[in-house]
């Protein structure tokens, strides 16, 4: 193998190519700002040079806490162009969680949007972070200042350290880490998932294929860029030469304004977001082809019907942070046009088959044997291939466990249908997916342990058309103790991120929450029935 027949794969090549092929084409829309592909590449180069001038060395982590701004998109190229590793953090994290990820990742630099400064803990909780860069709408030319021992500078100050001196849009090792994405775990501590340049490159191509992108694509960022690097669409839309339309916050009225003003053709997101869009007062039938790719929870027949009524094509994908976001797609079959809408929606709600760039999924029993493809026998969904993470950062034991038997174990339970399509039946990792966010039930339960009135608690996800799952907290109070639902949620708001606080709090008598014979695990199926019955009587059924 030589340079003549092998070059390491990297998403950096995507921007290099598009800047050469489409130099004057609109690449980014962000508020009043617009960037051509030439300007996109120039800005990535400038920021990469600025990072190098700021002391970033190969392999150093650069953390971002930003909404879907141009700066966040540019980071997906600038950070690896400088040889660094991007750590894009969930903008809804609490200060404690931001501190944990900063310390665990060993980030040297933190770039944060001005409106998220309240989510940043004190300097002593940030570990190796030596400087914080603040992205503000109005960028004053300010000198760097010190805040509790932490150097604080404006984004314009950072830009001023850069230049347009070219850097190679290449890497020596395609297995080098391009980003670390943190995901909730059953212990409540996030795990750092390592993405390689090769995996990101290939998954981005899969996104292009299965979301049906072309150079004419106008992609609206309804999906957070911090979610699996925007399902690798940060790189994919750039690769095909499409236009990125940034969305700072998910508000249906702003989404519809941008849809019409910019001629949006594609958007991704959780069913909760798509339902909000479809039901907005501004909603109207599309006058052009619009492709909606959804994941995070199975789309309900209601949601699919509402989007199709607007003229959208709905594509359902499935994956996890550990597989670069989407790994499978519910590939459309021609005969589905002939079935009634309810049956079509049921078929489309399945998780489907491996993407073109992925290997096939298997459903296995505890001995790693394939279960019958009968649509009834449950087993664990396992995956492998180029679209699987390198491993968990600084956690060899968890990595080894996840890769048992040479396959990545998703922890999700599913069935294999006779047509080879996988259907997810349950989440086996104690994770509730609500509004596209992963919420650790264990974390919420543990946060409540110290409440003086609580003796026991269980968190469960209840199916919900809008959120995918609604988080419900079941509480058992100590004998003689008193507490209201407001007391409980107020207690939790001080300890976990706001999106993890349950939407409903139900009180149960001691012994009423169904447990296994050993009293060590809640029987979720039985508890779900009790919860749904309770919600039904209170009129709070999703």
Feature names for model-found ranges:
Residues 23, 134, 147-153, 160-182, ...:
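Conserved pre-ATP/AMP-binding loop-to-beta segment of ANL
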Residues 201-218, 226-266, 280-281:
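Conserved AMP-binding/adenylation subdomain of ANL enzymes
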Residues 3, 7, 12, 16, ...:
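Conserved AMP-binding/adenylate-forming core of the ANL superfamily
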Residues 239, 261-269, 278-346, 359-360, ...:
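Gly/Ser/Thr-rich phosphate-binding loop
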Residues 53-54, 81-157, 479-481, 494:
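Structural core segment of the AMP-binding/adenylate-forming
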Residues 354, 360-382, 418-419, 481-485, ...:
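Conserved beta-loop-beta connector loops within the AMP-binding
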Residues 497-521, 538-542:
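AMP-binding/adenylate-forming catalytic domain of the ANL superfamily
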Residues 93, 110-112, 267, 385, ...:
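AMP-binding/adenylate-forming catalytic core of the ANL superfamily
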